Curated annotation (Swiss-Prot):
Keywords: Allosteric enzyme, Cytoplasm, Hydrolase, Metal-binding, Protease, Sodium, Threonine protease. This is ATP-dependent protease subunit HslV. It comes from the Bacteria. The active site is at 5. One of its GO terms (cellular component) is proteasome core complex. The gene is hslV. A double ring-shaped homohexamer of HslV is capped on each side by a ring-shaped HslU homohexamer. The assembly of the HslU/HslV complex is dependent on binding of ATP.
Length: 180
């Protein structure tokens, strides 16, 4: 399991949101509390976040963005091409990172082995050491609470930060909202 972060992605009726906490841990020591582990890609049309080794994640972001540009922003094609490249490259297969990527139509988890997984419900995914806590909270809030997409992500990450020692409550989010 990758320690040191929690990333949650949510695709709601009016917008898609990605959020992450700010904690960077090394062993049992907190090195930084305000890191940003989420990004906007392709001029803000795609949202992405990572869990795992920071250096590995930046390499993956760069590679994914290059592939995303070559597919002219088609997220589905990009994740498939990314997975193919990841699986055939011996160096990439040793990287210790996972990514979540989403737009308004799709949400995908890209694993450290090159797997591409679209969540069963098509709208909520989480990675990192606090990912299961955030995922459970997001599912409950999605089902029972009357809150907007951004509040759902922030509250779910806050809950994860209160439970997981590798996750804090310094939360950053990015959003893609539907045009009005």
């Amino acid at each position: 399991m990758f320690h040191a972060t929690t990333i949650l992605a949510y695709k709601g009726n009016k917008g898609s949101i990605i959020g992450g906490d700010g904690q960077v841990s090394f062993g049992n020591t907190v090195l930084k509390g305000n890191a940003v582990k989420i990004r906007k890609l392709l001029g803000g049309k795609i949202l992405a976040g990572f869990a795992g080794s920071t250096a590995d994640a930046f390499n993956l972001f760069d590679m994914f963005e290059r592939i995303l540009e070559s597919t002219k922003g088609d997220l589905l094609k990009a994740v498939i091409e990314f997975s193919k490249e990841w699986r055939k490259d011996k160096v990439l297969r040793k990287l210790e990172a996972m990514m979540l990527v989403l737009d308004r139509e799709h949400i995908f988890l890209l694993s450290g082995t090159g797997d591409v997984v679209e969540p069963e419900d098509g709208k909520i995914a989480a990675i990192g050491s606090g990912g299961n806590y955030a995922l459970a909270a997001a599912r409950a809030l999605d089902k029972f609470a009357d809150i907007n997409e951004e509040e759902l992500v922030k509250e779910s990450l806050k809950i994860a930060g209160e439970i997981c020692i590798y996750t804090n409550t310094n939360i950053k989010t990015y959003a893609l909202w539907d045009e009005k």
